[in-house]
Amino acid sequence: MSLNAETKAAIVAEYAQSEGDTGSPEVQVALLTASINHLQGHFANHKHDHHSRRGLLRMVSSRRKLLDYLKGKNLARYQDLIKRLGLRR
């Protein structure tokens, strides 16, 4: 199950660099993080759902690539995003 439109709109509004920004790495990483967190809750009840687990691993990999890109482009934005999302505990 994916995120609903209201949740996505709230995440986009919070992490967007400018009005109407949906493609910046910050927004993409925030949306992926929300989906990953949602799926982790799903796996608490459905341990043997291997098809969804593959999707989860794909999202984690995609998020890692976007974070690596952002880290190479602008370290300050990367560190701010990591802190805001609570990653790298």
UniProtKB/Swiss-Prot annotation:
Pfam family membership, one: Ribosomal_S15
- Report the SMART domains cross-referenced here: Ribosomal_S15
- Function noted in UniProt: One of the primary rRNA binding proteins, it binds directly to 16S rRNA where it helps nucleate assembly of the platform of the 30S subunit by binding and bridging several RNA helices of the 16S rRNA.
Under Gene Ontology molecular function, one entry of this record is: rRNA binding
For this chain, the annotated S-S bridges are none
Q: Does the keyword rRNA-binding apply?
A: yes
Q: Does the keyword GTP-binding apply?
A: no
Q: Which InterPro entries match?
A: Ribosomal_uS15, Ribosomal_uS15_bac-type, uS15_NS1_RNA-bd_sf
What UniProt keywords are attached to this protein's entry?
Ribonucleoprotein, Ribosomal protein, RNA-binding, rRNA-binding
What are the annotated GO cellular component locations?
cytosolic small ribosomal subunit
Highest taxon above the source species: Bacteria
* Protein name in the entry: Small ribosomal subunit protein uS15
Q: Which organism is it from?
A: Aliivibrio fischeri (strain ATCC 700601 / ES114) (Vibrio fischeri)
Q: Matching PANTHER family, A to Z?
A: RIBOSOMAL PROTEIN S15, BACTERIAL AND ORGANELLAR, SMALL RIBOSOMAL SUBUNIT PROTEIN US15M
